[in-house]
Amino acid sequence: MAVEEEGLRVFQSVRIKIGEAKNLPSYPGPNKMRDCYCTVNLDQEEVFRTKIVEKSLCPFYGEDFYCEIPRSFRHLSFYIFDRDVFRRDSIIGKVAIQKEDLQRYHNRDTWFQLQHVDADSEVQGKVHLELRLSEVITDTGVVCHKLAARIFECQGLPIVNGQCDPYATVTLAGPFRSEAKKTKVKKKTNNPQFDEVFYFEVTRPCSYSKKSHFDFEEEDVDKLEIRVDLWNASNLKFGDEFLGELRIPLHVLRYASSYEAWYFLQPRDNGSKSVKPDDLGSLRLNVVYTEDHVFSSEYYSPLRDLLLKSADVEPVSASAAHILGEVCRDKQEAAIPLVRLLLHYGRVVPFISAIASAEVKRTQDPNTIFRGNSLTSKCIDETMKLAGMHYLHVTLKPTIEEICQSHKSCEIDPVKLKDGENLENNMESLRQYVDRIFSVITKSGVSCPTVMCDIFFSLREAAAKRFQDDLDVRYTAVSSFIFLRFFAPAILSPNLFQLTPHHTDPQTSRTLTLISKTIQTLGSLSKSKSASFKESYMATFYEFFNEQKYADAVKNFLDLISSSGRRDPKSIEQPILLKEGFMIKRAQGRKRFGMKNFKKRWFRLTNHEFTYQKSKGDQPLCNIPIENILAVERLEEESFRMKNMFQVIQPERALYIQANNCVEAKDWIDILTKVSQCNQKRLTVFHPSAYLNGHWLCCRASSDTAIGCTPCTGGLPANIQLDIDGDRETERIYSLFNLYMGKLEKMQEACGSKSVYDGPEQEEYSTFIIDDPQETYRTLKQVIAGVGTLEQEHAQYRRNKFKKTRYGSQEHPIGDKSFQNYIRQQSEISTHSI
């Protein structure tokens, strides 16, 4: 989801690898071990949770998480919890990374010390406040000065133990006085609207009886302050919980009679600092945060056109897309946006065919074909992930789920056998699993996506043409991707391919490792099977599969998925599971009488229908055909005082649903919008609030059939497999070119050197593939010019934004140190440019 700003869209995403924790404090009991899990939070909102690792003080998680971030945030936080069967799970510690600091840890493993968690560490939110100093004449005719402190509202207050009933205290404090006032308690909201005014006498009336203007003494101004404290009203015996505070020196009114601003809440000055960070252990993380500022499409035309014609450039090494792979530090970094862009415009097959053919021509040994981490390999990997994910799920998921649920021991290493286990029984169980997975893979050829088949056909042709004497190379060229880089990794780590929600337990992980090794060897068609294994027990196990029928099945499968002109006979009309999970829904009012309460239900979306049931596997309680979905929109929080709600609008009624967090809500809205995009009766307007108590809360219309009062949001492309924003991917590629501008210029130098010097290649230029220096130089010149033009647009946007930025506004509250640094940096840039 993009945050709309003037003239551009802002996209945020984060990719996280949660590695492990170490040296957690021991449990205060005889066992001393803990059952721990880790959560990922945007500020305080949990968006992901790892599995529970039992009985460990150094738990290994090994889990990956990716999400598009649909809202603004200040901190990306990680909490380590200790599970408690009888009470609320307790927090051991947390890691909080400020949004502005995320780039410091970009894409590298980092150990973070766990910090203590208390009320002060959990402070978040902002307050809108106005101070006004006025002159008042008393009943006796004496002139005095009154301070009016108006607290309008708060936003984003922390939720304590699942609830937030906030109130504020406003205190005028000085060395010899402290006068406090209190607002009303606002129930069940962390965005309270107070709009209350409190009056304080600033000076003694006699002090100003002869003055007609504001001229109170310097020492009075410097020593007085307004303090606002936010509290959560609690019925617990421990008292109300602290939510945050702010302090405003009264000298802000020295030059004006009123002052109004937004403030970030801060922890108390005397907050708890008794626990040393080292006492709580540490957590290993790898975080990749990306923020893209995307202009309208016409800005990207020159660079986009240059990239899209890459397949037609001779030689392909002189193309803009190939050059991107040459200058990026990591080939995958280039492949991800490149493949998405080319897929979006239907140019991925010609480009991959061209770079694959060029790579094959440089390969000397058919046994090493496509075995390196080249741009070709990374582009094909990314294409298979994008286009083949549904194919992978249909093929493997049922068997993988059964393996995870059965918990059968399949250990065949005699050294690792547990007491009471039988080697022959384990070997037979493993053989059955391998046979089943091998069978479903080799029979799935007709379901392989067309774009993958077209790529495999080009690989097969290029390899057969290059190594005409090797009859097996046409198979190994394809199997090196479909088996070694697609099926085998998915079996080994199913959580990375969304086949399982979390990393599997150690025993299941071991079973999947053994299956993956065997499938990889079967698919490789290597001539010496036993030599493929370092372990003798694997060589012994493989004797079960040392029959010609297995090799024939692999070849038939590879022939089918790499045949010229083959098309997927399976129509998109077949039911495809797109998304499922628990959410909370409000009764739709299908019954004339009765309470419209909220209940937890298991939701399931296919390309045919949207259903919900009590639990996974139960019969559906409600079926909504896709053609009956007229719109999918967010529901305003004020409707039910519940966050992350959206509505699925049908001809007769709307289904109100609450997702578990903002990320999940965005995912459901996006996919539901996508599958219903082509419905002919889609609405153009809707009601953003609910119909309650005889009227719509948004427009106050009394009829429940009243036409909507707000335009529907823009839809997404109606493409079930891929949802790609071409402009966003071009912006990502621009960012990479801009980041590696030094390498682009170095590559230009290499082209010049090669054009005029025929001797041995200089070492600093040897890392570049330059087949045609003149053509490569021309492309580089165009790339640098296109990147420069876009950089000017970004610089102009930053200047315009800086001019309009007001410190203390709702978007940029006072108290944000990172924003103060931004102001200072932009001021320096502006001064330098002048």
Swiss-Prot record:
Q: Which residues form the Ras-GAP domain?
A: 346-561
Task: List the GO biological process terms.
Answer: cellular response to heat; intracellular signal transduction; negative regulation of Ras protein signal transduction; platelet activation
Enumerate the residues binding Zn(2+).
687, 698-699, 709
Keywords noted in UniProt: Acetylation, GTPase activation, Metal-binding, Phosphoprotein, Repeat, Zinc, Zinc-finger
Task: Domain (PH): give its ranges.
Answer: 576-677
At which residues is N-acetylalanine found? 2
What Gene Ontology terms describe where this protein resides (cellular component)?
Answer: cytoplasmic side of plasma membrane
SUPFAM superfamilies given for it? Answer: C2 domain (Calcium/lipid-binding domain, CaLB), GTPase activation domain, GAP, PH domain-like
Where is the PTM Phosphotyrosine found along the chain?
66
Note the superkingdom of the native organism. Eukaryota
> Zinc fingers (Btk-type): which spans?
679-715
User: Start and end of every C2 domain?
Assistant: 1-112, 123-263
Q: Which residues carry this modification: Phosphothreonine?
A: 110
Q: Which GO terms describe its molecular function?
A: calcium channel regulator activity; GTPase activator activity; zinc ion binding
Name the CDD domains for this protein. Answer: C2A_RasA2_RasA3, C2B_RasA3, PH_GAP1_mammal-like, RasGAP_RASA3
Annotated site, Arginine finger, chain positions: 371
Q: Which residues carry this modification: Phosphoserine?
A: 77, 809, 833
Describe its function: Inhibitory regulator of the Ras-cyclic AMP pathway. Binds inositol tetrakisphosphate (IP4).
This protein is called Ras GTPase-activating protein 3
Name the species this protein comes from: Rattus norvegicus
Report the gene name: Rasa3
